[in-house]
């Protein structure tokens, strides 16, 4: 069995690749980059270029590894990637793939939009087995701009989430769940897991934890949705539509959409997910002022 890992250098795919490599599990990484040279067997994969899809399976044959039988399916959430995602699943089936692990999101139900449509498509195929992973917001988002710059330069976190709470999850834990699912496949045809952290935290609480870990006061600045969208657009430089979408998602959190509990990480992997305090201790150098 060879596993195709899409998402190349993404947060979860890169971590999954490391776990598979350490375990000696045959896998091939599909990446949109044509120049990146990584430590694993890689092949070019472009959602908008169908020639690269069939080349993935040819590459496995040329490399002398077992045929691809399972795919870690990571796609963008843009509407224009839904149809290519469906077509790729069908191409993969024609190449003998019968197992898929789809990375979706906690707030995307089957059949709704983006990855939810791919979820529904997989569910309609009686000859395949699939697992859908539905993680909540990544802890690692705070290690990227604009959050990391706000924390380092201003000692602030800006959001429109108000007092809304999120069960923040580490990408390491998402990768552990994906690894366990792919390497210890159960007999069920269809399954979905909510991949959530061990605690519900507001950004006020996140700021308090960072204050303790970093030894300086970090403040959560609660903004109205329109004000956050304006900040992301004018100060951060995000496209207006994207800034508005992110601000809207945060308002959803304010209204309680991410208040969820799940023990799926422990059920699948046998161990609890990382707490935000432990994550902050591990990553605190990233927020330190130099």
From Swiss-Prot:
<dbReference type="InterPro" id="IPR019901">
    <property type="entry name" value="Ergot_alkaloid_biosynthesis"/>
</dbReference>
<dbReference type="GO" id="GO:0009821">
    <property type="term" value="P:alkaloid biosynthetic process"/>
</dbReference>
<dbReference type="InterPro" id="IPR051604">
    <property type="entry name" value="Ergot_Alk_Oxidoreductase"/>
</dbReference>
<keyword id="KW-0560">Oxidoreductase</keyword>
<comment type="pathway">
    <text>Alkaloid biosynthesis; ergot alkaloid biosynthesis.</text>
</comment>
<dbReference type="GO" id="GO:1900809">
    <property type="term" value="P:fumigaclavine C biosynthetic process"/>
</dbReference>
<dbReference type="InterPro" id="IPR007110">
    <property type="entry name" value="Ig-like_dom"/>
</dbReference>
<dbReference type="GO" id="GO:0016646">
    <property type="term" value="F:oxidoreductase activity, acting on the CH-NH group of donors, NAD or NADP as acceptor"/>
</dbReference>
<comment type="similarity">
    <text>Belongs to the fgaFS/easG family.</text>
</comment>
<comment type="function">
    <text>Festuclavine dehydrogenase; part of the gene cluster that mediates the biosynthesis of fumiclavanine C, a fungal ergot alkaloid. DmaW catalyzes the first step of ergot alkaloid biosynthesis by condensing dimethylallyl diphosphate (DMAP) and tryptophan to form 4-dimethylallyl-L-tryptophan. The second step is catalyzed by the methyltransferase easF that methylates 4-dimethylallyl-L-tryptophan in the presence of S-adenosyl-L-methionine, resulting in the formation of 4-dimethylallyl-L-abrine.</text>
</comment>
<dbReference type="InterPro" id="IPR036291">
    <property type="entry name" value="NAD(P)-bd_dom_sf"/>
</dbReference>
<protein>
    <recommendedName>
        <fullName>Festuclavine dehydrogenase easG</fullName>
        <ecNumber>1.5.1.44</ecNumber>
    </recommendedName>
</protein>
<dbReference type="GO" id="GO:0035837">
    <property type="term" value="P:ergot alkaloid biosynthetic process"/>
</dbReference>
<keyword id="KW-0017">Alkaloid metabolism</keyword>
<keyword id="KW-0520">NAD</keyword>
């Amino acid at each position: 069995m060879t596993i195709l890992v899409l998402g190349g250098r993404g947060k979860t795919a890169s971590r999954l690749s490391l776990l598979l490599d350490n375990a000696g599990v045959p896998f091939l990484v599909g990446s949109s980059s044509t120049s990146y040279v990584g430590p694993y067997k890689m092949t070019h994969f472009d959602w908008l270029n169908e020639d690269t899809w069939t080349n993935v399976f040819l590459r496995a044959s040329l490399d002398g590894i077992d045929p691809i039988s399972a795919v870690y399916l990571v796609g963008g959430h843009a509407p224009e990637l839904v149809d290519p995602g469906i077509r790729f699943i069908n191409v993969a089936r024609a190449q003998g793939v019968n197992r898929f692990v789809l990375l979706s999101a906690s707030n995307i139900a089957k059949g709704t939009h983006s990855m939810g449509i791919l979820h529904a498509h997989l569910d309609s195929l009686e000859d395949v087995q699939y697992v859908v992973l539905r993680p909540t917001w990544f802890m690692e988002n705070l290690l990227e701009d604009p959050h990391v710059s706000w924390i380092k330069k201003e000692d602030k976190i800006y959001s429109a989430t108000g007092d809304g709470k999120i069960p923040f999850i580490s990408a390491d834990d998402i990768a552990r769940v994906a690894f366990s699912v792919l390497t210890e496949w159960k007999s069920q045809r269809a399954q979905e897991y909510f991949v959530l952290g061990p605690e519900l935290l507001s950004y006020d609480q996140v700021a308090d934890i960072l204050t303790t870990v970093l030894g300086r006061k970090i403040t959560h600045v609660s903004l109205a949705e329109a004000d956050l969208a304006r900040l992301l657009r004018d100060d951060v430089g995000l496209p207006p539509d994207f800034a508005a979408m992110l601000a809207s998602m945060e308002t959803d959190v304010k209204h309680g959409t991410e208040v969820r509990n799940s023990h799926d990480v422990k059920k699948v992997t046998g161990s609890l997910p990382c707490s935000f305090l432990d994550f902050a201790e591990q990553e605190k150098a990233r927020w330190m002022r130099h």
